[in-house]
Amino acid sequence: MSMVYLIRPLKLLVIFVATSCVSLPTMAFEPLNTDDAGTIGKNVNQIEQYFYVLHNNVAGNPGGEASPGEEFRGIGNAKAFPLTYTYGLSESTEMSLATTYYSTPRGSYAPFANNILGLKWRFMGDGGSGFGMAIKPMITLPASTSQQVQGLGLAKTNYKLHYMLSYYWDSFQVHTNISYARNPYNKNYPISGSYAPNQTNIVSGSIAPVWIVNSWLKLALDIGSSIDTLPNSGAVNDYGMVAAIFSINKNIDIGLSYLQSGTTPSNAVSGKGITSDRSEIGVTWRF
């Protein structure tokens, strides 16, 4: 893990992302939080297996506006292996199944949580040039009450609708996301020991400009914010991330990232008063 923690000192939040060759369909942007409007293509399979180390300073905080499936609402440290399988139903649609195995924390509950079903539809563009738009509804299956108590999920079905807008140039890309999440939970049980009201109606936005260095390396910035839509509620999280993904060949990418989040953008960037931080490394395989 020493290679991952080399990224921690960086305060200017610049993301290094490498994926497949530019001429190929755009693939999912793991480990970025911001997704792109591209799809993997008909009959293509994709597996994303990652490992992250996360520290939360605030109970109930969802891991710094976490990537879908990587939410951790407990306080303290977590170590987990998020896994996502994606299958291309057509050139413009894909379905995904995701789960996360937690090695830390452990207890008298199943270590698998954040079980998510997703369907992505690109309704504008070819996913590789010019404008592209896509939507992705997602359903997170209920966690057990024991998992909710530890912050490994919420003990009710959660829903999210994700909108993606991308623009692709030859050497530059911009991806923006807007989403709404409905996150009910079992109020008879705490979330990581806290009975304080959890954010249940979340609107999120993010942007990730991407600089294409060559066919195996991209550089990007990923920043975002989430706001509770309830009256008198402020920002839930602002985040910034650094990452690097190296394309071994056209079908295999190795990525690593570092994320900081805070209750204000300046906290997220400076690292002062951060609510959480996450280091992540993993591989994406298409076949």
Name the predicted role of every residue range.
Residues S2-V14:
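Bacterial N-terminal signal peptides that target proteins for export
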Residues M27-F287:
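Transmembrane beta-barrel domains of Gram-negative outer membranes and organellar outer membranes
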